[in-house]
């Protein structure tokens, strides 16, 4: 039945994804709502809220503010807060309320810029899409607003450029708050410095994005931003997840029929890791509840028929019942959906699905 959920909780909406991208960058994040969306973001969708400080606010819209379009009140609140906080920028993030009343985000951005000394960006999310769509919009808005040509990069060749940029690092996508440190170590062991935008690295690194020798896309939501940086600065990008090897336990995968359920980049990185270990192209299907990008399949040389989009719980249940898999990689909360499965179930935690981080 369409929309029926018996096992999975509702996935995080787009405004949560936008907050996740901007959370660690030192800005003032104003969620344009009455308070409910902000409560969900801080209470459920952003695990760093309990460990790391960030200036996340609700606009506190009242009924008549929304009905009469009193943007001036939001501007006044934000300007007052900006005077009391040590922040580097302000971001206004949309929800269903401004979507319904047709808020003009460009006008709002101009009004806020005049009232404060801060750079202001807006993310036109509406609460109707999933978290990854909000991430995609936020990454693009972030690099469009703050990345600029660094004079140092003009005379550099790729070997001289100081770092690798990692785009797509959010808890929703990588499900591990230590993943950024692990990735930095992976590249440090190769004599390179990795910058994980939005997870341990701040706004200055975004401003210096032109210095990157290469960008690594670790989630589908980051692809548009990487393409933008390639167009603007000529920075090449690759699609990969550097920690894929730690997600694949030492098991005999030879000749097995395998299903991997995750976000598209990690799922296909796990596929490649398995094929690397077996030395063969195994019968592997990847599936995701979230966005799919044809460019990712083309880049990784994966047939589109082997990459499935799941929309309903029944899609996953039917896929398992009808295709006879020997091994399934998926979030542990999905195991109860397939009690008749007799093969091997390997936990592959996805915070966006279960709200749980990797142990």
What are these model-predicted stretches?
Residues 1-359:
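An N-terminal assembly and electron-transfer interface module characteristic of large anaerobic redox
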């Amino acid at each position: 039945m369409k929309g029926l959920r018996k096992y999975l909780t509702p996935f995080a909406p787009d405004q949560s994804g936008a907050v996740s991208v901007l959370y660690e960058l030192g800005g003032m994040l104003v969620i344009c709502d009455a308070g409910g969306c902000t409560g969900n973001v801080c209470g459920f969708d952003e695990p760093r809220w309990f460990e790391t400080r960030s200036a996340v606010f609700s606009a506190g819209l009242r009924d008549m503010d929304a009905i009469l379009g009193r943007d001036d009140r939001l501007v006044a609140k934000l300007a007052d807060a900006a005077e009391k906080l040590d922040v580097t920028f302000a971001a206004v993030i949309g929800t269903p309320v401004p979507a319904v009343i047709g808020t003009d985000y460009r006008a709002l951005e101009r009004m806020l810029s005049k009232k404060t000394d801060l750079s202001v960006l807006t993310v036109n999310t509406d609460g109707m899409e999933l978290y990854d769509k909000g991430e995609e919009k936020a990454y693009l808005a972030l690099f469009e607003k703050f990345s600029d040509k660094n004079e140092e990069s003009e005379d550099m060749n790729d070997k001289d450029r100081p770092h690798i940029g990692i785009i797509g690092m959010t808890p929703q996508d990588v499900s591990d708050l230590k993943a950024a440190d692990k990735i930095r170590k992976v590249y440090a062991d190769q004599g390179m410095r990795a910058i994980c935008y939005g997870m341990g690295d701040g706004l200055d690194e975004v401003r210096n994005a032109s210095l990157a020798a290469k960008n690594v896309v670790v989630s589908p939501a980051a692809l548009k931003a990487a393409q933008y940086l390639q167009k603007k600065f000529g920075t090449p990008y690759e699609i990969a997840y550097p920690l894929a090897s730690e997600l694949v336990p030492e098991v005999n995968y030879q000749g097995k029929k395998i299903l991997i359920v995750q976000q598209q980049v990690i799922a296909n990185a796990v596929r490649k890791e398995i094929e690397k270990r077996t030395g063969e192209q195994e019968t592997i299907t990847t599936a995701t509840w979230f966005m799919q990008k044809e460019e990712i399949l083309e880049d990784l040389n994966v047939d589109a028929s082997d990459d499935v989009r799941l929309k309903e719980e029944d899609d996953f249940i039917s896929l398992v019942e009808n295709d006879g898999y020997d091994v399934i990689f998926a979030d542990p909360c999905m195991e109860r959906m397939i009690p008749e499965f007799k093969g091997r179930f390997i936990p592959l935690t996805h915070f966006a699905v279960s709200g749980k981080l990797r142990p």
